[in-house]
Regions:
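Phosphate-backbone binding interfaces of nucleic-acid-interacting proteins
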Residues: 1-214, 349, 368, 372, ...
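Glycine/proline-enriched, intrinsically flexible loops and inter-domain linkers
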Residues: 5, 24, 64, 198, ...
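Extended, well-folded interaction surfaces typified by the phenylalanyl-tRNA synthetase beta subunit core
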Residues: 422-584, 719, 772-776, 780-805
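Beta-rich nucleic-acid/ligand-interaction surfaces
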Residues: 40-44, 211-212, 497-498, 502, ...
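Mobile "lid/hinge" segments at catalytic clefts and subdomain interfaces of large enzymes
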Residues: 120-135, 144-149, 163, 171, ...
């Protein structure tokens, strides 16, 4: 955001400060000035002169000798400029003066000093200047000739400062405006801050433009089909338009802000945009079919040619301005070539609207077009500002004689923004700032920026253009800004301290990290987007939900074009990279999100789930990985109820070495050996093992409320159980029987032997468990142990298990 000091003084006429004073004070009150440029920094001793007489140079065909009246005397200047004639008034740099650079437009640091000298034997006591030599350009001064000396208008006063006459005795400030201060994206907002900073009167323009006795609604009809994307649309009509140059003062204001003057109509819309921070657009009403404006979403693949002559392709997320037949503009971004203003325009339709900032930002990015207007709309403008801006534009049209304003306005208002109200709490404000200000002093500071006090409700009322005022802390900041941050006394911090505590989900994540790192795993991180080709690499079935990846609209490339639905690709890629680097024993883990759409194309936000993923190869096997998972479940209070189901059906895992981890009937994760074909596809030449635990599912069952039992007072009784077990029976099934049938007196059990050999019949294996029985309140009797063992044996028999003799 740039503004010139002269433009600010139009609204703060009593402002009298140097550029450095302005910079320091404004920065201290929160409107940070990044830097400034004095337009006349390298200009000196330049006055308006009038050419009284021109003679040919006796020794040079391309040079002429001019006698120039500079007010106090006449000086002789030799020049080669082809465009001067007797009577012209020109900028003259006198002997010892300085210009900013050469006629090629390149500036010289510190300027170029001009001295009296001779050209082909003829004395020259100065130099007449082109606009480029004065440090500016023809874009900023369109009346300047393409080649040659700048010619002043006839009413220029001979002898006066040419720098002042050209408006170069000015300073342009560059600001760093934060996104919450939308009001400061206009010169009026900056001027309001300057007036408050220097305690001067703020004099905004008095906007009043009723127009003639006609009605704008008789000229145009406005329909807004999507009120959420267009909270307000204002339209006014100006007829009998006369296109011509804008006045010099307006051109100078625009030039200082880096905007090239074009004509009175275009300059007025740009001027109001810079003044109010409200983008505007003008349409030739005669090109608007049906005299109707329709604000609607574009159609998918709709083509549209913008003012810059580029054809652009729209989708249904882009908001368009249309007439009765066609699109005439992209809302909030740029108008169309088919409705552009020409010198033959007779009737103009002015538009001042408020569009949804998020939609404008995404649309601008989607079609690859960003403009000054879209940059302002992105911040979220005040709908109440649109009417004042369009009235100001019409007022300027009347004042400059550029047309006849039609009475009334077509105003489609879908949102009336109410002023924000914040409770006034002087004690809280003093506590936050460490000050001892009275309520009256606070209210005086707040009044500087138009924050008023409602006595009846004891509230601070913020105008609608101050979208950043919502809480007491915001009010305290306003007080601090104008009291002076440098005046706030040094105090020790005070307040109520509370014990910090991690959210439950973060505690689970911390446990996952601790367990993984304790077991020798190193943390890795992979991209959240990947190539759709990995679905085939993982051997996913055609109807697998993991193939339903969300396509990214602006991917880094094909390899990063969909959001990941599984973390396996990233883990296996990392294992493969380590294997290719000949790292022999690798253990990695990752805590990362996967993105599962409810349906495609997206109609709502996808299901975003965090997965705890483990991967390893080298010195480890399936049971090592299972042990890490059990350790995790132990720490989160779930181990005793986690079952392992080998029928998980994962096509990317070895069919005989995989299992779902199930808690209370719900799958919380899976583990297994990577399928050899998948490992080969990734270039992993060793057996690899992975485990994936869904953290969000774990959150449903996890608990850190651990229960502790006292030290046993009574003796334990041990029984060994040796069995012949069918190979189809899983250890988990046996342990389930032991837990359910052993009752409360079964304290623990331990598998201590597995045997397969000639002494065991085919299809069976021998397994031996050690069972520990104990009662916490008394010494166990043999009958109690016998009864428990009988229940256990009956349960094992149901599984086809026989006791060994």
């Amino acid at each position: 955001m740039n503004t010139s000091l002269s433009w600010i003084k139009m609204y703060v006429p009593d402002l009298d400060v140097t550029a450095q004073e302005y910079t320091d004070a404004m920065t201290l009150t929160g409107t940070k000035v990044e830097g400034f440029e004095k337009l006349d920094a390298d200009l000196d001793k330049i006055v308006i002169g009038q050419i009284d007489k021109i003679e040919k140079h006796p020794d040079a065909d391309k040079l002429i000798i001019c006698q120039v009246n500079i007010g106090t005397e006449s000086v002789q200047i030799v020049t080669g400029a082809p465009n001067v004639k007797e009577g012209d008034k020109v900028p003259v740099v006198l002997d010892g003066g300085r210009v900013a650079g050469g006629h090629d437009g390149k500036k010289t640091p510190g300027g170029i000093e001009i001295k009296k000298g001779k050209l082909r034997g003829i004395e020259s006591c100065g130099m007449m200047c082109s606009i480029e030599e004065l440090g500016s350009t023809r874009e900023m001064y369109p009346e300047a000739p393409e080649y040659g000396i700048y010619i002043f208008p006839e009413d220029a006063v001979v002898g006066e400062s040419a720098i002042k006459a050209l408006g170069l005795d000015d300073v342009v400030f560059e600001y760093e405006i934060t996104s919450n201060r939308v009001d400061c994206y206009g010169v009026l907002g900056i001027a309001r801050e300057a007036a408050a900073t220097f305690d001067k009167k703020f004099c905004p323009p008095v906007v009043e433009c009723k127009g003639n006795d006609e009605k704008a609604s008789d000229y145009v009809k406005v329909t807004v089909e999507d009120p959420q994307l267009c909270p307000r649309y204002c339209a006014r009509v100006v007829k009998n338009v006369k296109i011509g140059p804008s006045p010099k003062w307006m051109q100078r204001c625009l030039a200082a802000n880096g905007i090239r003057p074009i004509n009175n109509l275009v300059d007025i819309t740009n001027y109001v945009m810079e003044e109010f921070g409200q983008p505007m657009h003008a349409y030739d009403l005669d090109t608007i079919a049906g005299k109707e404006i329709v604000v609607r979403r574009a159609k998918n693949d709709e083509k549209f040619v913008t003012l810059d002559g580029q054809e652009r392709t729209m989708d249904d997320q882009v908001l368009m301005i249309c007439d009765g037949e066609k699109a005439v503009g992209i809302a909030g971004i740029m108008g169309g070539e088919n409705s552009m203003i020409t010198d033959n325009v007779k009737t103009v339709l002015f538009e001042a609207a408020c569009f949804d900032g998020t939609n404008i930002r995404l649309s601008s990015k989607r079609i690859g077009l960003r403009t000054d207007a879209s940059g302002k709309f992105e911040k979220g403008l005040d709908p109440n500002n649109a009417q004042a801006a369009i009235d100001r534009a019409c007022q300027l049209m009347e004042e400059l004689g550029a047309g006849e304003v039609v009475g009334g306005m077509v105003d489609v208002c879908n949102e009336v923004r109410e002023p924000s109200r914040v409770p006034f709490k002087p004690e809280k404000i003093n506590a936050l700032l460490g000050t001892d200000l009275t309520p009256e002093e606070m209210l005086a500071y707040l009044a500087k920026v138009e924050l008023t006090y409602d006595k009846e409700t004891n509230e601070i009322v913020a105008p609608t253009f101050r979208q950043d005022i919502h809480y007491v802390a915001d009010v305290a900041e306003e007080v601090a800004r104008f009291f002076g941050y440098d005046k706030i006394p040094t105090t020790l911090p005070s307040g109520e301290a509370t014990t910090g505590k991690l959210p439950f989900k973060l505690r689970i994540e911390a446990v996952a990290r601790d367990i993984a790192e304790y077991c020798g795993f190193s943390e890795g991180m992979s991209y959240s987007f990947e190539s759709p080709k990995v679905f085939d690499k993982l051997r996913l079935q055609a109807d697998s939900e993991l193939r339903q990846g969300i396509v990214i609209s602006n991917p880094l490339g094909e390899d990063y074009s969909v959001m990941r639905t599984t973390t396996l690709n990233g883990m296996l890629s990392s294992l493969a990279t380590n294997y290719n680097r000949r790292n022999k024993d690798v253990r990695l883990y990752e805590l990362g999100n996967v993105y599962r759409p409810h349906s495609l194309p997206l109609t709502e936000l996808p299901d975003e789930r965090m997965h705890f993923t483990l991967g390893m190869y080298g010195n480890g096997d399936f049971f090592d990985m299972k042990g890490v998972c059990e350790e995790f479940f132990e720490k989160v209070g779930m181990r005793d109820k986690v079952d392992y189901d080998p029928n998980s059906g994962k096509t990317y895992l070895h069919p005989g070495r995989q299992a779902n981890m199930i808690y209370d009937g719900k799958v919380v994760g899976y583990l297994g050996e990577v399928h050899p074909l998948v490992a080969d596809a990734y270039g992993i030449g060793d057996k690899a093992y992975v485990a994936v635990i869904d953290i969000l599912t774990v959150l449903e069952f996890a608990s850190f409320n651990h229960k502790y039992t006292g030290i046993a007072k009574y003796p334990a009784v041990t029984r060994d159980l040796s069995m012949v077990v069918p190979k189809t029976v899983l250890a988990g099934q046996i342990e389930h029987v032991l837990t359910q049938r052993g009752g409360k007196i079964l304290e623990s059990y331990q598998l201590f032997d597995i045997y397969e050999g000639n002494q065991i019949k085919e299809g069976y294996k021998s397994m031996a468990y050690s069972l520990v029985f104990r009662h916490h309140d008394k010494t166990l009797e043999e009958s109690e142990i016998t009864a428990a063992m009988k229940k256990i044996l009956n349960g094992l028999t149901d599984l086809g298990i026989e006791l060994r003799s």
